[in-house]
Amino acid sequence: PTQNYTRYSLRGSFDQGVGKYFRFGLVNNTNYNVTKGSNIGLYGVLAMSPIANPYNADGTLKRTVKYNSQDESFVLTRGVVEELEDSWLSKTEGFGTYNNLFAEVKCPWVEGLKYRVNLGLNYRSTKGGSFTGEGINSTTADTPSTASLNHSETTNWTVENLLTYDRTFGKHQLNVVGMYSAEQTVYTRSDVAGRDIPAEYFQFYNIGRAEGTITVNPDNWNYQKSGLMSWMGRVMYTYDNRYMLMATVRADASSRLAKGHQWHTYP
């Protein structure tokens, strides 16, 4: 009952010509979403014995149900989950914007020759937190409260330059393309957790006030930066729309590869 997902999206584009030789445009896709209650699982309810009695003699709900000397589980009902809405919760916010821009110009002095640049700018951010109050979802009433907070961010840019020559001479058609592109991606992630939060209204917003252990696990912190660079050339000749010859060469370099072995060429 306390789980929900909300998403807002915005998309727009335009393609505008200026005179006979210049054209530019943009495509944008932006979204924002919120996910709540993902830490509240139903497995405990599904796994509970159908003959278990979750009620006390006076009709009130028990805190836990014990099947035998070893098996005991926290009682979960819709009412319990709703009552604990501010004491047992999680929230994840995601924002992303993806943008592609281009500009194209034709050479007025050379028929069939044009230059185009494509630019991609992307950003993605995710921020999430969870909080479980004292004794909640635990067979022990004094189990310390816990909270965690994490954040990740990804930025990416791509630039692609294309020079194209495309002409038809009678039955002969010639298409020549040269391309240079580069891109870079940066990813960061951070995470912190705490035990024994002094006040439930702190939830996961003030983990620094935790009276118990504050955990900063280095395995949950990350920074990555990578890049890719490419060159490409292609020549294609067609005769009478029946016969075609094509030659292509491409070279890529990746920062993820070892120095001295970053460039690879593909004929």
Residue ranges and their predicted role:
Residues 1-4, 15-19, 109:
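Outer-membrane beta-barrel pore proteins
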Residues 2, 255-260:
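Solvent-exposed loop/turn segments connecting transmembrane beta-strands
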Residues 9, 13-98, 114-230, 256:
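Surface-exposed loop/interface segments of Gram-negative outer-membrane beta-barrel transport/assembly proteins
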Residues 10-12, 117, 159-161, 229-235, ...:
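Extended, hydrophobic alpha-helical segments in both membrane/secreted and soluble proteins
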Residues 12, 16-17, 28, 103-107, ...:
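Residue-level signature of outer-membrane beta-barrel architecture
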Residues 20, 109-111, 170-172, 241, ...:
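Short coil turns and loop connectors of transmembrane beta-barrels in diderm outer membranes
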Residues 134-135, 263-265:
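Glycine-rich, phosphate-binding/catalytic loops in enzymes
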